[in-house]
């Protein structure tokens, strides 16, 4: 996805060998046109996967997921990271370690938003160690549903997540694959 690659190279900041800051268009200020284009790419790739719902994890995956759900005319579910008085009782939960924040959180899904017949597309902003995507997949599979695919905006190909998801047999489609990060240097796989 050439527009995304261009934005990463022009506006992204490699803060270290494993941290890429893209807050000018993805996770602080959001470029709606770019999100719409991402939705088109995800729709085109996953259109024959018999998807029934699209899941994302709050919060940075929401914008590209909304655009994908709109274009595929499918419901979208936001998996919650924060505890809430509203999310009690009939829920699925799993513990996930956040690479970015260095902490664990409980990923939560209300049972009423999934059933055994669902084929779920999971979309997230980053794939690093694979913890978030695997946590979402655990919730889906724990409900007896199927993970139809995983859409990633930016994959850090040099970290363990991509290989881990591949070994588990998931169909992963990444819009940008970062080959290498060094302070001030970003290299994208073509």
From Swiss-Prot:
Matching Pfam families: Pribosyltran
Where, in this chain's numbering, is xanthine bound? 20, 27, 156
The reaction(s) catalysed by this protein are: XMP + diphosphate = xanthine + 5-phospho-alpha-D-ribose 1-diphosphate
The Gene Ontology biological process annotation of the record reads: purine ribonucleoside salvage; xanthine metabolic process; XMP salvage
What span is annotated as the signal peptide, if there is one?
Answer: none
Q: Which family does it belong to?
A: Belongs to the purine/pyrimidine phosphoribosyltransferase family. Xpt subfamily.
The protein here is known as: Xanthine phosphoribosyltransferase
Q: Which organism is it from?
A: Clostridium botulinum (strain Eklund 17B / Type B)
């Amino acid at each position: 996805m050439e527009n995304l690659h261009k934005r990463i190279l022009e506006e992204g900041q490699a803060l270290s060998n494993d941290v890429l800051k893209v807050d000018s268009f993805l996770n602080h200020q959001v470029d709606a046109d770019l999100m719409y284009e991402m939705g088109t790419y995800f729709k085109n790739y996953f259109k024959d996967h018999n998807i029934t719902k699209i899941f994302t994890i709050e919060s940075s995956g929401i914008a590209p997921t909304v655009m994908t759900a709109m274009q595929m005319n499918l419901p979208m579910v936001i998996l919650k990271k924060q505890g809430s008085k509203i999310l009690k009782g009939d829920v699925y939960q799993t513990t996930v370690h956040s690479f970015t924040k260095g902490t664990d959180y409980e990923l939560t899904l209300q049972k009423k938003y999934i059933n055994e017949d669902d084929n779920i597309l999971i979309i997230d902003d980053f794939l690093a160690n694979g913890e978030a995507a695997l946590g979402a997949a655990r919730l889906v599979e724990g409900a007896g549903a199927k993970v139809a695919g995983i859409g990633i905006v930016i994959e850090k190909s040099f970290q363990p997540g991509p290989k881990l998801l591949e070994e588990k047999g998931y169909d992963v489609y990444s819009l940008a694959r970062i080959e290498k990060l060094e302070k001030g240097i970003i290299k994208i796989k073509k």
